[in-house]
UniProtKB/Swiss-Prot annotation:
Family in the record: Belongs to the SfsA family.
PANTHER family, per database record: SUGAR FERMENTATION STIMULATION PROTEIN A (PTHR30545:SF2)
Disulfide bond entries: none
Gene Ontology molecular function: DNA binding
Protein name: Sugar fermentation stimulation protein homolog
Lineage: Bacteria, Pseudomonadati, Pseudomonadota, Gammaproteobacteria, Oceanospirillales
Encoding gene, per UniProt annotation: sfsA
Length: 239
């Protein structure tokens, strides 16, 4: 996923009302941008001015023309905070054949229903996929006062929706189909991924149960820069 022109570097002043953020541009002007992230953004928004990257939709009629894409977080790392990006990154990589274990030759579909749930991606025919993929944006890294250990966690707040997805992924496996949970780790300091048991113990419990029941879990680190976002290397899962 290349950005041409590159993302604009600004200074984040504040995030508020969940979906809004105020930033200052290089010329000193202040604008409000869209913040597409429903999580707490713990250890991403640090509480004071910090470097950020924004994209421009090019649409002057949009209420908030610009979108918050990434933040410089503790220890000088960057985290991608636009939760719409991981789905596109994973789909792009699957279609490009980056993951031999996720063969796209039979087709790649978006937003596919299974029961009363909807998964981000599926492989095979839309009416009868053989593989369901749920993608998660993983950004919870160490804070400013924490050791920079490179272990990035999910979720950053209690997620009943995420818990439901894990239960449905287990149902998928029980039905004879393949289920994959893909942790897209948008954090430049990442060396491993883990469940954030201290935030959502139930999610961690269900994740381990899902793995025991045949759900496949992949974790990949994404490059986060003004020029491009791309999945670059697999990460170990610290359970």
């Amino acid at each position: 996923m290349k950005f041409d022109p590159p993302l604009e570097t600004v200074t984040l002043l504040r995030r508020y009302k969940r979906f809004m953020a105020d930033v200052v541009r290089a010329d000193g002007s202040e604008i409000t941008v869209h913040c597409p992230n429903t999580g707490s953004m713990k250890n991403c928004v640090l509480g004071g001015p910090q470097q950020a990257l924004i994209s421009d939709s090019g649409n002057p009629k949009r209420k908030y023309r610009h979108t918050l894409e990434a933040l410089q977080v503790a220890h000088g790392h960057w985290a991608g905070v636009n939760t719409a990006r991981p789905n596109a990154l994973v789909e792009e990589a699957v279609r490009a054949g980056q993951f031999p274990m996720l063969d796209s030759t039979s087709g790649v579909e978006r937003e596919v229903k299974y029961g009363d749930s909807r998964f981000d991606l599926a492989l095979g025919e839309r009416a009868d996929p053989h593989t369901f993929i749920e993608v998660k944006n993983v950004t919870l890294g160490p804070g400013p006062d924490d050791k920079d250990d490179g272990v990035i966690a999910f979720p950053d707040s209690v997620t009943e929706r995420g818990q439901k997805h894990l239960q449905t992924l287990m149902d998928v496996v029980a039905s004879g189909k393949r289920a994959v949970l893909f942790f897209c780790v948008q954090h430049s300091g990442a060396t491993a991924a883990r469940p954030a048991d201290e935030i959502d113990a139930r999610y961690g419990q269900l994740l381990r149960e899902a793995i025991e029941n045949g759900v496949e879990v992949l974790a990949w680190k994404s490059e986060v820069s003004a020029q491009c976002f791309r999945l670059k290397e697999p990460l170990p899962l610290d359970l």
